[in-house]
Amino acid sequence: MTGSPPTLPPPPLLPRLVGIGSWAIFLALFLASAHFTNFSLQTLAQGIPDFFAFFGKMWPLDWRALPEIGQPLLETLQIAYLGTLFGGILAIPFIFLGSRNTTANPVVMWGVRGFLTLVRSVPDLLYAAICVGILSFGPLPGVVAIVIFTASVLAKLGSETVEAIDPGPLEALQAVGAGRIQQIVYGVVPQIAATMASYVLYIFEINVRASTVLGFVGAGGIGQLLRTYLSFFDYRSTAVLILIVFGVVLLIDAVSSYARSKLI
């Protein structure tokens, strides 16, 4: 008796339709976005000579700009540091109020989460512009903008970290009658300390980069000097400034990455 090879059933129709539909939606969104943004590969190709011509204006570098770069660069680092420090402190209560396992009232939890989502939806550059209008020009509006951004992001990351902890220590503390604060201090903080320290270092990296452009709206830092150079078409000094900022950010990233690798 000769046996015929088994015939595989055809693949289900619904998953195939879902896959085809997903690709169709993706393609439609791509074409619509390209149309409404006037995206054109031809225009990009035509701009390549201008791109190289722009960078050609930056050579040779004008190293005479170095003395006036130091103070604004230091101010930028101070804005990022203070913003990260105070933002981290401000985030602490929101971390625990926005976590399921540390908040007894779900209304409070969802209220805090909604508030944080609203705060995060506003770009830090817009916060800086608003603070400049309220507090006048200078580094203080930049610090306030970084504080708001840092607090909202760390609170979000922190609440998710708290919800992922081992519930055993919390249950043990509840069993012996520990209060809410004691449960957080002894059952939660030891489990999230290293991860949160890593997040803080990462946010500091982001804040250093963000602080370099806050000066464009008058919020202090090296961004103000960069805007001045560009306004006067001083591309050679602009190149020196960009090179210095790149080196500092690269150094901070390397140190922060090493520190975070030791924490986790």
Regions found by a protein language model. Give the residues of each.
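Cytoplasmic-entry segments and transmembrane alpha-helices of multi-pass inner-membrane transporters
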Residues: 94-128, 157-160
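C-terminal transmembrane helix and the adjacent membrane-cytosol boundary/short C-terminal tail
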Residues: 12, 18-22, 239-264
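Hydrophobic positions within alpha-helical transmembrane segments of bacterial inner-membrane proteins
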Residues: 84-92, 96, 100, 125, ...
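N-terminal, non-cleaved signal-anchor transmembrane helix
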Residues: 1-85, 92-93, 97, 101, ...
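Glycine-rich helix-loop "coupling/hinge" segments at transmembrane-helix boundaries
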Residues: 133, 208-245, 264
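Generic hydrophobic transmembrane alpha-helix motif, especially the helices
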Residues: 116-150
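Membrane-cytosol interface at the C-terminal ends of specific transmembrane alpha-helices
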Residues: 138-188, 194-203, 254
